[in-house]
């Protein structure tokens, strides 16, 4: 904006306007006379015109200012309106975005709710399908028996079994005529409930029923306590027939055939007809338990089981069943401490030979039954497998055992070891039944079972002879080392211990000769210690803490005294060897 307030005074020297009607006067006189008055008028006119011009300028200036102000106000209003419109647009956009986000969230929630509803609907359908299946199964199989019904059925079975026992007059044993019906609770495998080591369990003392008993006499209605009992029994039977034991390999001879079943039935009929007044048979449960634990058995663990001939029939009508009640396993320790008289395997074999039964039936039974049910192999079968070289050794062992037994009886001392099976077989008369020997009580539990056959005894004899040879070589080596140490000492101190060394050499030679003539009968591991020298030679061998007896065969008294003397002499030698080495 230009500032128009500054006023400019203009005084023109030449008159701007002249009257057009007046003629031009060229006279100088007249001009000079009238110039003063005209100049003043003209100046006044000029001043007035200037004032008018100034006023006009001011008016124009004000008009311009007012127009500018109006335009400025209009522009400001337009700008504010534009700004407000822009803000409104932004707000609307923000609102639109928020609405879109909310719509998206709502859509997601709706989708999730729909998925949940679908899953819920699927679950409900599955539950309905399962319920329908259960209802159809229940309708097909029938009602499931309750626990009270099972308990009443068990009580009835127990009462019936006790009645059968009391009628026969034998409260502790179950006769052949007693019949027991098993419910679904008794259909458990022998592996799940194995008998304890101390004796046979209650389930092993009950004879399993035969399929004939089901057909002849069945006092109760055949109810099913579980819906899938038939399927389970079939599956258990298949598993029992096809399963292989981890302890022993399955053999083809263990599988039951119809011919073997007929032989077993024939043996039962002959045994019951030949000895009607004999005592009750031993339980078959122990046989089945032993067979199932010690190896694979062909007995299915179901209600329809075949009857095996009990071991009491094989051993004899009056033989005890203490060996049957004892649970034995080759992988478990043999605990016989505090155990009463038990039959040895050879006496069982003798009882089997004395039993007057058809040879064909007995051979069929022996071929059909597994080795775990028949117990150890009889002596007659074992001797066929032994070669001719072993027979001479068996005769020698038998003669030695008889001599030892006669010496013990003549001296009147109680035998330390029980009589061997060979001596019992020779001394027992054929008319009378052989008495069962007693087990020697063990001081501690052995990790391996006792030898139960002649082959095991032969193996132990060979091991003992090898041990004696190694011990003799060791003694010779000790003697050589002792002689070397003595020679070294003599070189170091030739004058001091000359006489003592000569005497000791003479004694050592005599003792070595005596030792070669009569070696100790039992293998002894000697621990040389300096404390043994202070003791007198009258102390027996067992009292020394440095002597550990591994095994000793009882021989003559002279042999024992010589062994004691040689052991003490070897202890003295050991002390001298240690001194020489130091």
UniProtKB/Swiss-Prot annotation:
It holds the Pfam family HDAC4_Gln. Residues 189-254, 270-314, 409-447, 496-567 are annotated as: Disordered. InterPro entries: Hist_deacetylase_Gln_rich_N (IPR024643). The keyword Ion transport does not apply. Keywords: Chromatin regulator, Hydrolase, Nucleus, Repressor, Transcription, Transcription regulation. It is an enzyme of class 3 (hydrolase). GO terms for biological process: angiogenesis; chromatin organization; lymph vessel development; primitive erythrocyte differentiation; primitive hemopoiesis; vasculature development. Residues 146-195 are annotated as: Interaction with mef2. Homodimer. Interacts with mef2. This is Histone deacetylase 9-B. It comes from Danio rerio. The gene is hdac9b.
């Amino acid at each position: 904006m230009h500032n128009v307030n500054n006023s400019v005074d203009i005084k023109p020297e030449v008159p701007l306007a002249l009257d057009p009607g007046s003629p031009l006067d060229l006279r100088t006189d007249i001009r000079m006379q009238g110039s003063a008055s005209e100049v003043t008028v003209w100046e006044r006119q000029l001043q007035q015109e200037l004032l008018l011009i100034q006023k006009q300028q001011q008016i124009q200036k004000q008009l311009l200012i007012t127009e500018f102000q109006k335009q400025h106000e209009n522009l400001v209003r337009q700008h504010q309106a534009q700004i407000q419109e822009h803000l409104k647009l932004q707000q609307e956009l923000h609102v639109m975005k928020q609405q879109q986000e909310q719509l998206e969230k709502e859509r997601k929630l709706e989708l999730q709710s729909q998925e949940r509803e679908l899953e819920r609907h699927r679950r409900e359908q599955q539950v309905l399908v399962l319920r329908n299946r259960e209802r159809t199964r229940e309708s097909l199989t029938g009602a499931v028996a309750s626990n009270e019904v099972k308990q009443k059925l068990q009580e009835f079975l127990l009462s019936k079994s006790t009645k059968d026992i009391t009628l026969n007059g034998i409260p502790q044993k179950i006769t052949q005529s007693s019949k027991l019906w098993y419910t679904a609770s008794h259909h458990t495998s022998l592996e799940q409930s194995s008998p304890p080591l101390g004796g046979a369990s209650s389930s092993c003392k009950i004879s399993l029923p035969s399929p004939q008993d089901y057909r002849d006499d069945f006092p109760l209605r055949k109810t099913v306590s579980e819906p899938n009992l038939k399927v389970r029994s079939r599956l258990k039977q298949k598993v029992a027939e096809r399963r292989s034991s981890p302890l022993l390999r399955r053999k083809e001879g263990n599988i039951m055939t119809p011919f073997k079943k007929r032989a077993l039935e024939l043996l039962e009929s002959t045994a019951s007809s030949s000895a009607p007044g004999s005592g009750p048979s031993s339980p078959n449960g122990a046989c089945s338990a032993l067979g199932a634990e010690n190896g694979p058995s062909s007995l299915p663990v179901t209600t329809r089981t075949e009857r095996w001939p009990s071991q009491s029939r094989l051993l004899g009508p009056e033989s005890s069943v203490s060996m049957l009640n004892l649970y034995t396993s080759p992988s478990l320790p043999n605990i016989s401490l505090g155990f009463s008289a038990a039959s040895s395997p050879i006496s069982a074999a003798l009882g089997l030979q004395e039993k007057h039964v058809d040879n064909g039936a007995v051979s069929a039974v022996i071929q059909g039954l597994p080795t775990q049910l028949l117990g150890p192999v009889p002596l007659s079968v074992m001797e066929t497998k032994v070669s001719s070289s072993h027979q001479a050794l068996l005769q020698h062992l038998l003669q030695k055992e008889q001599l030892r037994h006669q010496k013990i009886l003549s001296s009147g001392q109680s035998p330390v070891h029980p009589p061997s099976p060979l001596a019992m077989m020779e001394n027992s008369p054929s008319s009378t039944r052989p008495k069962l020997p007693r087990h020697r009580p063990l001081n501690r539990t052995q990790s391996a079972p006792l030898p139960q056959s002649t082959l095991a005894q032969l193996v132990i004899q060979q091991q003992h002879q090898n041990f004696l040879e190694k011990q003799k070589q060791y003694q010779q080596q000790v003697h050589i080392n002792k002689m070397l140490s003595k020679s070294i000492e003599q070189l170091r101190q030739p004058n001091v211990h000359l006489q003592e060394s000569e005497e000791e050499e003479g004694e050592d030679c005599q003792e070595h000769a005596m030792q070669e003539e009569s070696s100790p009968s039992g293998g002894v591991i000697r621990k040389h210690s300096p404390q043994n020298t202070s003791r007198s030679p009258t102390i027996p061998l067992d009292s020394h803490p440095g002597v550990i007896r591994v095994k000793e065969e009882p021989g003559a008294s002279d042999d024992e005294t010589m062994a004691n003397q040689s052991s003490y002499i070897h202890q003295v030698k050991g002390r001298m060897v240690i001194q020489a080495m130091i």
